[in-house]
Amino acid sequence: MTVEREREASGRVPGAVWRGTALQVLGRFWGAACTLAILWLASGALDGAGFGRFTFYIALFAWLDSVANMGTGQVAVQRTAAAPARMASVLAAARGIRVRAGLFGVLLCASFVLARDEADGAWIVLASLYPVTHALELSTIPARNALSWSVPVAVRAIAAAISLGNVLALWLAGVDRPALYLLGVALGSTVGNVLLHLASRHHLPRERGEAASESGFFREALPLGISALCAQTYFYVDNLFVEAWCGLEPLGHYNVAVRVMSWSIMLAQYTTLTVLPWLRREQLAGALGPALARLGPSLFAGAGLACGLALPWTGSLLALFGEEFRAAANSLRWLLGATTAIYAGSLFMTALVALGRNVASLWIAALGVLLNIGLNIWAVPALGIDGAALTTCATEVFVALAGAAVILRAGVSLGSPWRWLGGPLGLAAGAGLSSLLAMGY
C-alpha cells in the first residue's frame, strides 16, 4: 500500500483533493468574474424585460445541461475510479447517452420556444445545441480520476473568456436582442468542450470501446440524471413563478441574486466534483465515514461564517449592477442561507453516489422538487421574489438533512453531531459580527 493510499484509508484528505479544489476555485473565480461581467454588459444593453428574458433562458440552458449530462459523468467515475481498464467502453457508453440526451434537450427547447412564440426563436434554438457537445467533455474523466485538474480548469477559463468576448462584441455593436447574447454565451461553452477534448486526447485509451459491453450503464445513470434534473428544477423553477406573478423586470433582479449565490457555492461544487473518485475508493476500502467526518464539518462551518459576514452587505453588492437591483437584497440574504446548507448537502449527495445509492439520490431530489413547487405556489404570490428565495433556502435545508439521514441509515458514521453545528453557528456569528462592523462598532 502506498503512502497516499494509507492516508486515504485513514480518512485523511489527500493533498491532491485540496490542490484540485483550489485550482477549480481559482478557475471558478475567473469564470464568475466573466459571468458577472456578462450580466453587467447585458443589463446595460437590454431593457428590463429583455434582460429578464436573457436570464430566464440562461437558467433554462443550465437545466438543459443536466438533461445532456444525464448522470453519465458520475457513473463513469463510479466504474473507472478503481478500474481504469474499463475506460474505453465506459466513455463510449456515456458519450452515446449524452449525444442522444442533448438532442432531446434541443427538441424540448424548440417546443418551448414555439409555444411561447419567442422573438428570435431560431437563434435561441441554435444556442440550445451547445449541450450536445458535452459528450466531448467526458474526455476529462481520466484526469478527474487522477485528481488532476490543471488542464480542465485552464480550458474552462479560456471558454469563459470567449463567452465574455462575444458578449462584449455585441455590446460594443449596440445589439439589443437577448437571443444573440444567449448565442454568444453558448458559443463560448461549445468551444470550451471542443478544446477540453483536444487537450485530453493523449490520456484516452487508444482502442475503441464498445458501449454494449457496459451493461446497465444507462440504468445506473438514469437515477442520477433525473436527480440532477430535479436539483436544477428546484433551483430554477421559481423563474416560472416569479415571471408569472412579478413580471420580467423583477425576474432580472432576482436572477442576478441567484447568480451571486451560484458564485458563492463554487467551493462546494468543485470540492464535491474533485472528491468523488477519492470517496468512491474510500467507500470500497470501508473508510467513507472517517473521510466525510474529516472533510465536511470544517467546510460547512467556513461556509456559514463567510455567508454570515456577507448578509448585511447584500444591497451594496447588488447595487453594482444598478441601484434598482437593491430590490433583491432580502432575496440574496435567504439565498446565502441556502448556500450554507448546500455546503453540507452537496457533500452528502456526493457520498450517496460513492455509496452507489443512486436511487436514494433520486428520491431526495424528487421530494425536493415537490417541496419547492408547493412552497413557491404560496410564497411567490405572498412575498414576491423574497418568497422564491425563502423557498430555495428551505429546499436546500431539506436536501441536506435527507442526505445525512440516508447516509446514517446505510451504517456510515458522520462523526460527532456537534461538529456539524458549525454551519448554522458560523452563519449567526458572521452575521452578528458583520452587523456590528456595518454600524461602526
Residue ranges of predicted features:
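Helix-loop junctions and terminal segments of transmembrane helices
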Residues: 35, 39, 68-85, 261-296, ...
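Transmembrane alpha-helical segments of multi-pass transport proteins
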Residues: 33, 173, 368-371, 395, ...
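Membrane-interface junctions at transmembrane-helix termini in multi-pass inner-membrane proteins
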Residues: 79, 132-155, 336-365
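Hydrophobic alpha-helical transmembrane segments
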Residues: 124-128, 153-203, 367-372, 385-407
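Signature of the first transmembrane helix
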Residues: 3, 13-73, 106-109, 163-164, ...
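Interhelical loop/hinge segments that connect adjacent transmembrane helices in multipass membrane
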Residues: 2-17, 150, 154-155, 174, ...
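Alpha-helical transmembrane segments of polytopic membrane transporters and translocases
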Residues: 40-41, 51-69, 184, 238-240, ...
